[in-house]
UniProtKB/Swiss-Prot annotation:
Its EC number is 1.11.1.9. It comes from Xenopus laevis (African clawed frog). One of its GO terms (cellular component) is membrane. This is Probable glutathione peroxidase 8-A. It is a single-pass membrane protein. Its main location: membrane. Keywords: Membrane, Oxidoreductase, Peroxidase, Transmembrane, Transmembrane helix. It comes from the Eukaryota. The chain crosses the membrane at residues 18-40. InterPro entries: Glut_perox_Gpx7, Glutathione_peroxidase, GPX_CS, Thioredoxin-like_sf, Thioredoxin_domain. Belongs to the glutathione peroxidase family. The gene is gpx8-a. One of its GO terms (biological process) is response to oxidative stress. CDD domains: GSH_Peroxidase (cd00340). Pfam families: GSHPx.
Amino acid sequence: MEPLNPYPVKFSSPKAKVSVVFLSMLLCTGILCVLQLGFLRAKGGDFYSYEVTDAKGRAVALSKYRGKASLVVNVASGCPHAEANYRSLQELHREFGPSHFTVLAFPCNQFGESEPGTNQEIGALAKRNYGVTFPMFSKIKILGSEAEPAYRFLVDSTKKEPRWNFWKYLVDPQGQVVKYWRPDETAESIRPEVASLVRQIIMKKKEEL
């Protein structure tokens, strides 16, 4: 069988040729957009779709926290806000966790260079001084081109970039950010939002029984 059209297509005018080229470009652009959108949804559709590194250098899939409410915080041991924030975070973790809520702490040295220690030193200090029992991950960057992808998702979702240590993002069970707080906002202002989200989780689980 011979090809249906063995000869080059002849255009009746230059305008027709330009139109075909333009339409082809639009089609290719559309296909690329669809593929990119699918990739973004697969790789970064929610906070729990990312992987991070724990304090011992091991990969941790954040999907293990899916179904819980998470308060994600950039911590720093040498920050003036450290004591008040660590103690209030531990209190929230003790009160509402661990079945339905957790605090996820990410040390960062980008604000005032107030977290210069190693992962082991950071974790030991938090446990010794403040009785921290919530997860502490490897030290990361949250600003600039080297920002941790999971943190970049939080920033992109809220359009609010942390300006200092102990910036807090509340993530719902589906991995979407529902609220954020600055470091000077007290645990009392956070507790009602966490309590409300935890109640919703408990009610949903009861309905599914």
